[in-house]
Amino acid sequence: MTMRVALLVFAGCDLLDLGGPYEVLLTANRLAERRGQPAPFEVVTVGLDTQPVRAYGGLGLLAEQRVDEVGELDVVVVPGLVDVAAGTRDGPLIAAVRRLVTAAGLAASVCTGAFLLAEAGALRGLAATTHHEDLPELRARDDVGEVVGGRRWVDAGAVVTGAGLSSGLDLGLHLVDRLAGRELASATATQIEHPWDPDGRHEAS
């Protein structure tokens, strides 16, 4: 069964946070199809609207669909941003995150995307992680369960959170592992030439 995965695009989002899991999922699809198997993921980018926005650094991005027209999802991936305070105060953005989390069976974030999930109420009572520099700030919130350092990702069941930036690759591989199997995840890690630890260990804490 093909699983529908939406990646949220918004002004100021980090490119590596977005592109890491996006590339992993597309690569997993390509490897599956090469073996004569159906692609496990339907990957779509979604935004508050379908007008161009600029990611952090200025690169233009264009979402394929609006959040309000997405329908049911299996997974939503929320990237992070540099200006976390501005992101958590952005009412329309948080409303979009909340809507996507409600529509999806599984929510995921990369880096400071965890703060957007928290602001949307998705991390209450759940373990989570984020960029190592932002762990104290995430711990200071009262709407997050245990905040875990020293991990590339933390799987809390309904929500998976990734650490900083390049951890989006590891989070993407974990999603492939969890949803499509260890063998495809390992093959995907080899294809993208990324050293992957299926246990999500990380030297930074």
Where are these regions (language model features)?
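Extended, subdomain-level signal for the structured scaffold at the beginning of enzyme domains
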Residues: 1-107, 117-119, 136, 148-150, ...
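Short acidic alpha-helix initiation/capping motifs at coil-to-helix transition points
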Residues: 164-168
